[in-house]
């Protein structure tokens, strides 16, 4: 309600936007996982067996497809070589492509992170995008997988991947041998991780020669061996994928795979082993992944061994797979390239070893990789299609049971003569009559239709939920504008006007919505989604007189993506730190001229404050020195010296605590307070910067100070004629408007009414807020943030601590802008939070636009970008509310040099939610207060 006042309004804004920001995951990214499906496997002739008895899966975490196949300068040559000696880094893998198996590119989905990538490879399932938040935790995999369908799986590698698959499988079915997380050091030689895995595999087969029980277990069929090779991912993060370290790691992985393949073949000696080599995701040029850039989504896929089709030469007039030009410099044009979706790999592995297809798999068996008769391929395609249809039928039954009225998917509805059972019977008849190619084509068409049916069920509730959310956002915009007009234009003069009919109407709609949610067993969040639109529009209707009295304009804000593909540059870091240091020194030297003599504090207080500021400058200098030393040591691959790490943490913590010492020697001038805040965060920005961010911080702070002074000068200039006219009038001064008051530091002050020119201030703030978001890194793609800076404090893999440091760096510009706007708010003599409320009212025009632009299919880059855009726009309002509270902390006790009127009488505080109705007139006696 408009009576909520300032604190209530800001709290409501935060709660509403946090809840509605989650709505895209309830609408667009509902988990596809269901249970209760029957498993399906390929039907084989009596006495026949699966193509392979066992399967070995190699996953090179973070390996790009191009780096695996292209010609590259030999990383082992000395530095002085001219670089003309080009070589293939993975000769063994290349030999499998050319003469032993089938290859292609496995295209991944966003988020290109380890957990979703491995889930797609091993379960054939694309998790919803929000599942990336569990990628760094030990979390049971609550869906079916190839490991779960195997007789037994042995796995080696990182605990982040192996343990979650072990916990989610049938007890005792998966063995996971992992190394400690302390080995995942980004500043050390990560090849040790892969060597550890290869050595453990060799130990297992060596032990089998002495252990008859283990030997017998290893020789059973339907076994899977999983080697998770994390070295490339760790090396790529630390040194970039074009570094010699990354290229050497590729050579080591290739040699290790060669040795393990030979070891397995020698141990069994039956040529009944299938081998799969791939990656969970790629790696960008700046050593990160997560978004949909092609370098992250293209991974190699090489399959060879028992049951795998040999390499095929491209036929004239038939697509070779190389038409897109991606593999033009791989020198593999003489071999057919067969690209697949990442989830297809799970279906391929299940087929090769004769397992049931994972029941949640949406992967389509790539028949180009299968070495079998046309009948075998037709039966395999049929079983693959039956598995997906089974998932469709189960999900459809769940949907029917939950809805008041269900409309079936026409292409698979029996009412329309298109039942899946009829089409399956037709496929079986084609196989029985020997029309295998027709059966394969029909199965593929039915498979695609089943996926469309799953898509139909996944999006069934979209229209209903999106309509509710749209009414919620539009209602918030109208409610916020009504509140601003009521509080800061009409000063509480408008009254609510509810009628019995309006109360009955809105109550009936709310009851109807809640009844539908209750019948359908909807999550508790749906009730909140439905409550907010009713609440907002009921308030807008009740305050419609205030809305009609004001004038609201639609503000369209241009927006663009900024990309920040940065590399570490010590000189640029130094320039930024030098500007920060120079700014502080110049302030200390010319403090009297900057502040003016009329605002000088007591001599003791002035000296103490200058001494503390001198210590802050010392922290800036020390941060610059230790950052240069740490960066040089890391670039020289000497690791992070322990002393540097201790000093870095000491400077970071001390610089954030030192400003509190200024309370002992207060200097209340607003420029002095801004300089303290500037120097407080300077050491943090120096330590956590890798390139131009320090220069941005300096320029951003100077721009904000200039903006504050310019807006105040503009306000004084435009108000001067009015003041002069007031002095010349012979009429007695009018009483102060009792509605235009607020409480500041325990006293009541007069504030002015908002005008059209204040929209300019709000727009400038909105622009600067966008700059704070995007200038230190493209938050639309979190992978654009480099980890180089956090290595100076945390060199060992610790995602939560490293992420916290990156978030701290990201939030600093918001702290700076909140302090400046808080000061500007007071200098312009408008009510606290007035400008913040205007910004919150206009920001959701952009939010609603991005809500309808969210996509959950198509280009993976588009999916990730649209989600990020919506979340950024939605959280902007939440940030603004938080910044408003933060600004009060930063400007507490600041002297603004204003002529404000202290009102001696006790008056209600409209901004804090009390109406002016019945308020007594305020006395004329006002007292100038500096």
Curated annotation (Swiss-Prot):
Glycans are attached at residue 148. Pfam families: Phosphodiest, PigN. Residues 1-8, 488-498, 543-569, 633-639, 706-761, 825-833, 892-930 are cytoplasmic. It comes from the Eukaryota. GO terms for biological process: cell wall organization; GPI anchor biosynthetic process. Pathway: Glycolipid biosynthesis; glycosylphosphatidylinositol-anchor biosynthesis. It is found in: Endoplasmic reticulum membrane. GO terms for cellular component: endoplasmic reticulum membrane. It is an enzyme of class 2 (transferase). Residues 30-466, 520-521, 591-611, 661-684, 783-803, 855-870 are lumenal. Gene3D superfamilies: Alkaline Phosphatase, subunit A. Keywords: Cell wall biogenesis/degradation, Endoplasmic reticulum, Glycoprotein, GPI-anchor biosynthesis, Membrane, Transferase, Transmembrane, Transmembrane helix. Its EC number is 2.-.-.-. The chain crosses the membrane at residues 9-29, 467-487, 499-519, 522-542, 570-590, 612-632, 640-660, 685-705, 762-782, 804-824, 834-854, 871-891. InterPro entries: Alkaline_phosphatase_core_sf, GPI_EtnP_transferase_1, GPI_EtnP_transferase_1_C, Phosphodiest/P_Trfase, PIGN_N. GO terms for molecular function: mannose-ethanolamine phosphotransferase activity. The keyword Iron does not apply. It is a multi-pass membrane protein. Ethanolamine phosphate transferase involved in glycosylphosphatidylinositol-anchor biosynthesis. Transfers ethanolamine phosphate to the first alpha-1,4-linked mannose of the glycosylphosphatidylinositol precursor of GPI-anchor. Belongs to the PIGG/PIGN/PIGO family. PIGN subfamily. This is GPI ethanolamine phosphate transferase 1.
